[in-house]
Amino acid sequence: MSFDMDHEQFASFYGPTTGDSVRLGDTDLFAKIEKDLTVHGQESLFGGGKVLRDGMGVSATETRAENPMVADLIISDAIIIDWTGIYKADIGIRDGKILAIGKGGNPDVMDNVDFIVGASTEAISGEGMIVTAGGIDLHVHYITPSIAQAALDNGITTLFGGGTGPANGTRSATCNPGAWYTHRMLQAVDNAPINYGLMAKGSGSRPELIGEQIEAGCAAIKTHEDWGATAAGIENSIAAANKYDVQYAVHTDSLNEGGFVENTINAFNGNTVHTFHTEGAGGGHAPDIMVVAGQDNVLPSSTTPTNPYCKNTLDELFYMTMVCHNLNPKIPDDVAFAESRIRKQTEAAEDVLQDMGALSMMTSDAQAMGRVGEVAMRCWQLASKMKKVRGPLDGDSKYDDNNRIKRYVAKYTINPAICNGISDYVGSIEVGKYADLNIWDPKYFGTKPDMVIKNGMITYGIAGDPSSSLPTPEPVLERFLYGAEGRAVNHTCVTYVSQYAYDHGIKEQLGLNKTILPVHNTRSLTKANMKLNNYTPKTIEIDPQTYDVKIDGKLITCDAAPTLPLTQRYYLY
């Protein structure tokens, strides 16, 4: 005779199941579980007197050496939030990669087992917890090495950007200057407990100028107006990107000195381009850079300073711009330059375009107008705001915001991975990919992950007083853990380089210890490749006098948010 359990009691033991909804932090968003791949009555619960014991949920006979389906780690009964779906499953990890997603346990006594829990398997209790893929930030100024910890604080596990420290060039532009600095930066990040990729400086009128940086190990190219965003620089950078199969990103000409947005689009010549802070407050043709989001070949992203649009956004942006771009408040032309980039109309429209899926990615612009520790948080704040402003998306309903949730999680996971040619490795929770995962308590979702797993090992997470008798006493802080220590970093973290540098032995040439992987498949991408964020308006019009934005003839705007979720309730200081 089967045992009937009260639904509430079941959820308290094993976490929610199909049809149950989970609130994300203090937002207005609810994730509804679409399916449950575990087997009811045979859940792989760990703990005293529970299931994962020898001969019960743990196989007494299968060895890791003899059976490739024996996992190194099981995350049991987890709620997975990914662009691929919102569902419940056990996650099996082996050799740092996702081995299986479904039911983990002992096939000798359990039904429908997808991977085996053996004597060599570690356990993380995922009951009632949310698992997402590690976040990817494609717009990071490498000003301080401490940025790695700030990123991990919000579940960001991969950084792409450029720079050499607090030099003025780095404070303005996310690009690495030359082969010598590229080599030094590859060595500098070799022990950093996070994935890194470097972006070459896309300036000059010969592709060879950019190409030498790609050959030195850069994994992408960035043109920035502070170094000159001319048509020639764009065209030659794209030529180098096409030759070496790396992504090309651009921060366009705010002052319209070398041409207008139409000239820049012509310089793209139909090639794949990642446009940074596409709204324009972070930089770009004033006032109409956002029209590039209507181009099929453009992969558009936003940055955290303008998302979501709030009552204090405009005031903050002016001072950010002055500092980041080495401007002098005593020079009227410098002040005018900063003011030209700040437009409430385009910032309001940007929120809506993100919600429509016309803007495909979210990035930080870290320490140069944005905050690397807010990428995930800002995404979910924006999603919650847009639910209030625009209501449920098509297919969503009360206690079911799955379509909106999947759209927004894609903005900082799978889409950046696709954009920069690393989606074969990371960016989603799929079998065969590296296990870069975040585990969240739902009430802290989007703010502070309980654990950050890098290539299958806990690298960062919540831990209590090291001198206490338990792991839980205060002070409970986010701390670096064993995956971030010693030579483990060589296996838990990755540096991405160009295929050329990989093939020509950059790891051996520079004596690097980290895992080195090549980027690829970046040059034939279009907006259609952006998962759940591929809406391409037929027309985007920005009035040069009023800055009003129209999409396919319809005015697009929203009010500044007076308050936001995921704020002071979670961050007291």
UniProtKB/Swiss-Prot annotation:
What is catalysed by this protein? Answer: urea + 2 H2O + H(+) = hydrogencarbonate + 2 NH4(+)
Q: Does the keyword Metal-binding apply?
A: yes
Coding gene? ureC
Q: In which pathway does it act?
A: Nitrogen metabolism; urea degradation; CO(2) and NH(3) from urea (urease route): step 1/1
> For this UniProt entry, what's an example GO CC term?
cytoplasm
Sites bearing N6-carboxylysine, chain numbering: K222
What positions does UniProt annotate as the active site of this protein? H325
Q: What PTM annotation applies here?
A: Carboxylation allows a single lysine to coordinate two nickel ions.
Q: Tell me which CDD domains the record gives.
A: Urease_alpha (cd00375)
Cite the EC number: 3.5.1.5
Main subcellular localisation: cytoplasm
**How does the record describe its quaternary structure?**
Heterotrimer of UreA (gamma), UreB (beta) and UreC (alpha) subunits. Three heterotrimers associate to form the active enzyme.
Q: Which family does it belong to?
A: Belongs to the metallo-dependent hydrolases superfamily. Urease alpha subunit family.
What InterPro entries is this protein classified in?
Answer: Amidohydro-rel, Metal-dep_hydrolase_composite, Metal_Hydrolase, Urease_alpha_N_dom, Urease_alpha_subunit, Urease_AS, Urease_asu, Urease_asu_c
Q: Select a single GO molecular function from the record's annotations and give it.
A: nickel cation binding
A family per Pfam: Urease_alpha
Please state what class of enzyme this protein is: hydrolase
Keyword Metal-binding among UniProt keywords:
yes
Q: What is this protein called?
A: Urease subunit alpha
Q: Which domain of life is it from?
A: Bacteria
Biological classification of the source: Bacteria, Bacillati, Bacillota, Bacilli, Lactobacillales
Co-factor binding comment: Binds 2 nickel ions per subunit.
Which biological process annotations from GO are given for this protein? Answer: urea catabolic process
Query: What are the protein's UniProt keywords?
Result: Cytoplasm, Hydrolase, Metal-binding, Nickel
